[in-house]
């Protein structure tokens, strides 16, 4: 659109926390029966957002009218490492959840639906963490939509929906 002179606003979203519910990315029982959160993020931060907040942010962009026209708006409710996500899950679930940081290549080899695509996505987010997080600035996102949920806030409402296998 931009190449044809149409003024647009681009919205950059983040990892949907609902992937823990619907995409089989929630904690699973590992060797010894303990829960493990497996993500190929190493010690890098993962910008995340509740799916319902994406719609709310889009509404806020429309509501802003011409103020955001021609701009790129990144949205995220939180930036958390895999270890921080595992700790939040442990707190909400009331049981130990450890972080299992696979490499993107190991993740692609899991054989689960979408593992290759997710592995590529995670590799990009891991290798370009600074740029990816900066493009989804938490203060700017909250200025746009003050009701954005943090990972912990989303988790407290949705912990019972996450399948623990």
Question: What are the functions of these language-model segments?
Answer:
Residues 101:
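Conserved residues in the N-terminal Rossmann fold of short-chain dehydrogenase/reductase
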Residues 1-98, 107-114:
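Oxidoreductase cofactor-interface core, primarily capturing Rossmann-like NAD(P)-dependent enzymes
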Residues 104-165:
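A hydrophobic C-terminal alpha-helical subdomain
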């Amino acid at each position: 659109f931009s190449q044809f002179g149409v003024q647009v606003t681009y919205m950059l979203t983040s990892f949907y926390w609902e992937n823990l519910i619907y995409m089989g990315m929630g904690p699973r029982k590992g060797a010894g029966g303990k829960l493990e959160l497996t993500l190929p993020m190493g010690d890098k931060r993962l910008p995340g957002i509740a799916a319902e907040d994406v719609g709310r942010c889009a509404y806020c962009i429309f509501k802003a009218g011409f103020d955001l026209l021609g701009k790129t708006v990144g949205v995220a409710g939180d930036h958390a490492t895999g270890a921080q996500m595992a700790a939040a899950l442990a707190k909400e679930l009331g049981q130990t959840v450890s972080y299992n940081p696979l490499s993107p290549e190991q993740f692609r080899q899991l054989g689960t639906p979408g593992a290759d695509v997710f592995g590529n996505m995670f590799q990009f987010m891991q290798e370009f963490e600074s740029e990816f997080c900066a493009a989804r600035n938490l203060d700017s996102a909250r200025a746009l939509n003050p009701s954005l949920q943090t990972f912990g806030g989303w988790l407290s409402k949705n912990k019972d929906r996450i399948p623990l296998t």
